[in-house]
């Protein structure tokens, strides 16, 4: 019996050590991006990269071993990034990775007609190529369906307790910025049901080299939405040395600025305008070495969403329908 007790005690000690001490291979690390496909309501498969949130990485003295801490899923900010015309989701690889390491969950789609989202499934089951060069304003408006499908994916993650959809941020570059503003206006125009909240989840926009219109697809009407005019946190970034791009971005900024009160503390600004001296635009501007634009975006999200998360608490959003 004494031998049995000694063996049991030894096993218990080993078990306690295995649970109490994390082995090197079990140490937390920021997950790799996942390849995800969502389907827009008109049958277009949208290929995406999803960067799971909830992991905050900070540098340590050991340069090759950063410290990673876990963040509660219900506090995770979800972010959708929309590339520009003739772009693709990998254009946002660096920004998405940067934001993921700050604890956020990031979803980056190839918008229809771009990257790997270049086919549509017809009612008869056949597939047809999407010819980007032949896309017109109505086709560009169809990108709203792409974003809605992406949001549905994030919505499911919300209900699984992996993120808080109430803290949604949408970013876009050039044409992607037009889509972002139009989709935000749509999200805030959803009809509300007595027992179920629909939409009204976008709380911040990041617009990189925003254009007023492209191929007849415009953000002018969406900018007139009262929530976008006065309530949403908006960051605008443009390379100032490109006069045409700077003029369009300044016009958009001015339309929003005149309807908002100036903050007493710049850190409390809900409208931020960044204009580095360069001709680069869109994702090329975000990715240029030497400009801390990714850090600026991260700080903006920290100030406008993370620090205000108590104002938008997580809720279970299961539809009664």
Q: Each predicted region: which residue ranges?
A:
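Conserved alpha/beta-hydrolase
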Residues: 99-127
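N-terminal cap/lid segment of alpha/beta-hydrolase-fold proteins
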Residues: 21-73
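Alpha/beta-hydrolase fold nucleophile elbow
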Residues: 161-174
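Alpha/beta-hydrolase active-site loop
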Residues: 125-161
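The feature captures the conserved acid-bearing segment of alpha/beta-hydrolase catalytic domains
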Residues: 194-268
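The serine-hydrolase catalytic nucleophile loop
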Residues: 85-97
């Amino acid at each position: 019996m004494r031998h049995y007790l000694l063996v049991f005690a030894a096993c218990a000690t080993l078990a306690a050590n295995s649970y109490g001490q994390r082995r090197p291979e079990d140490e937390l690390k920021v997950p790799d991006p996942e390849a995800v496909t969502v389907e827009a309501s008109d049958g277009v498969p949208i290929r995406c990269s999803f960067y799971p949130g909830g992991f905050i990485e900070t540098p340590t003295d050991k340069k090759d071993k950063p410290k990673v801490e876990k963040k509660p899923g219900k506090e995770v900010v979800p972010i959708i990034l929309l590339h520009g015309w003739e772009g693709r989701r990998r254009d946002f690889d660096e920004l998405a990775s940067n934001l993921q390491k700050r604890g956020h969950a990031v979803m980056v789609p190839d918008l229809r007609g771009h990257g790997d989202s270049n086919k549509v499934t017809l009612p008869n089951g056949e597939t047809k190529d999407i010819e980007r060069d032949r896309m017109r304003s109505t086709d560009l408006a169809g990108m709203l369906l792409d974003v809605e499908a992406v949001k549905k994916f994030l919505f499911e993650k919300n209900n699984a307790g992996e993120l808080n959809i109430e803290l949604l941020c949408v970013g876009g570059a050039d044409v992607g910025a037009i889509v972002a503003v139009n989709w935000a206006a749509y999200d805030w125009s959803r009809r509300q049901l007595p027992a179920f909240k629909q939409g009204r989840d976008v709380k911040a926009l990041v617009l990189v080299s925003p254009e007023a219109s492209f191929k007849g697809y415009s953000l002018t009407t969406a900018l007139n939405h009262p929530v976008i005019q006065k309530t949403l946190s908006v960051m605008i970034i443009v390379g100032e040395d490109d006069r045409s791009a700077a003029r369009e971005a300044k016009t958009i900024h001015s339309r929003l600025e005149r309807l908002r009160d100036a903050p007493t503390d710049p850190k409390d600004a809900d409208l931020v305008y960044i204009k580095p001296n360069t001709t680069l635009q869109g994702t090329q501007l975000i990715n240029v070495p030497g400009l801390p634009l990714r850090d600026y975006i991260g700080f903006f999200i920290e100030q406008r969403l993370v620090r205000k998360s108590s104002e938008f608490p997580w809720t279970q959003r299961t539809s009664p329908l």
